Amino acid sequence: MRVCIVGASGKLGQHMVRLALDRGYEVVGVCREQSVVKLDAFEGRITVVPGATDERDVIERAVAGCDGVLVVLVPRGVHQYASGTAQAVLDYAPAGARLVFSCGWHITLDGQDVYSWKLKALVKIAGPIARLARFADLDDQVEACRRVFASDTRWTVVRGSDLEEGESQGLPVWSRHVGDPILQSNITRRVDFALFMVAALENDELIHQAPAIVGRQTPSSLAYATGP
């Protein structure tokens, strides 16, 4: 399988690169030119396409011939970075490719999610502040996911909880709606977020789903999980 990882130089991206290589995938990584050095550990093992992830010609070259595309949707700046990235992937990924996008719990597919007051306050207060500071635009990440949901591609949007570093606890558990009891712990190891993203490439049950994930060994997961 040939896989493109858009946003390969970040912490999540590097985990995905390593996990994809461990599975024997051919990997193409996209990252900003100034961040290419962060991928030096993989030199000779992956192809790197430098450039902003919302540059359409960069994405067009990177996804050519790929069976799957893993996309870190970063709401960077106030110039539609996330939606530009998503649109380029939707437009240029080969027909039939598996597309897996990462985002946070604040994204909703069907409006049935139930959010804690803390998360609602964070989005309501921090979002406008970040936008005023021209640092990030959460609304653009919402728009990016809206475009993904409306597309006829083979997409999955993985909604991550709060993240922590540490050794893998195994494949995270997931639920369709934030607010479900199994997600109550609201914490996932970053490496396991990456693991879920990579595993989703070959899990057709997740096509046209927006799974909200939580760590497999968290208290809520252990209390409510029914599967093996």
Regions found by a protein language model. Name each.
Residues W155, A200-A223:
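Core catalytic loop region at the nicotinamide-binding pocket of NAD(P)H-dependent oxidoreductases
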Residues T47-C66:
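Conserved Rossmann-fold cofactor-binding substructure of NAD(P)-dependent oxidoreductases
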Residues L109-D113, S151, E165-W174, A200-Q209:
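Glycine/proline-rich active-site loop of Rossmann-fold NAD(P)-dependent oxidoreductases
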Residues G65, V69-T108, E143-A144:
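NAD(P)-cofactor binding segment of oxidoreductase domains
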Residues V3-R23:
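N-terminal Rossmann NAD(P)H-binding glycine-rich loop of SDR-like oxidoreductase domains
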Residues V30-Q34, A52-T53:
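N-terminal Rossmann-fold cofactor-binding loop
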Residues C145-G166:
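Conserved beta-loop-beta element that borders a ligand/cofactor-binding pocket
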Residues Y81-A82, D139-D140, Q184-V198, Q209:
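Substrate-positioning beta->alpha
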